[in-house]
């Protein structure tokens, strides 16, 4: 093929565009996506956005609009705090420059570097932080299921479970029995069960003084 001026310029332009593409991406704003808006995910999103001074685009994907802290939730059971005291909105993160997407992350394409959303669409990223927290696996404990948590609330995740547990305490008959099972080691918050039963004891002392408390604990100490 004869390389005339028009062909040469066209080929040169295409080559320039190909070489320039990585540079354009490198010069663009880096994108960090955080999945999970609990204490870990929200803290990571906040400080990346804050410390980068807007030079990093941060997106937080979290389905709920209010995060209720499990820490201090025992004070609600004991009557020292209101439920609203445990709730935190995501407005503060937005004011720090975090793009908050209230949806479920349902998949990650590691090759395309995108996070699929339950509501449709996807969010692109350059770096991804996974901080979804913990949850129960249905059927993992013999004799217990996710449906049973409505009758026997664990309140390991603050929010509706915490409210249900307190409502059950309030509806206990005078002289009734409160039973709690402490988990075996290892688990996430070692003092948690004992903080909780102490707050339950305080509540019952004030409101149901003849009630009994039974703690089943598999740990020797």
Residue ranges of each PLM-predicted region?
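Short, well-ordered coil/turn residues at beta-beta hairpins
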Residues: 11, 131-132
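Beta1-alpha1 glycine-rich phosphate/pyrophosphate-binding loop at the start
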Residues: 27-99, 184-221
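Core beta-strand elements of the Rossmann-like FAD/NAD(P) dinucleotide-binding domain
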Residues: 119-127
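Glycine-rich dinucleotide-binding loop and its adjacent helix/turn
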Residues: 132-208
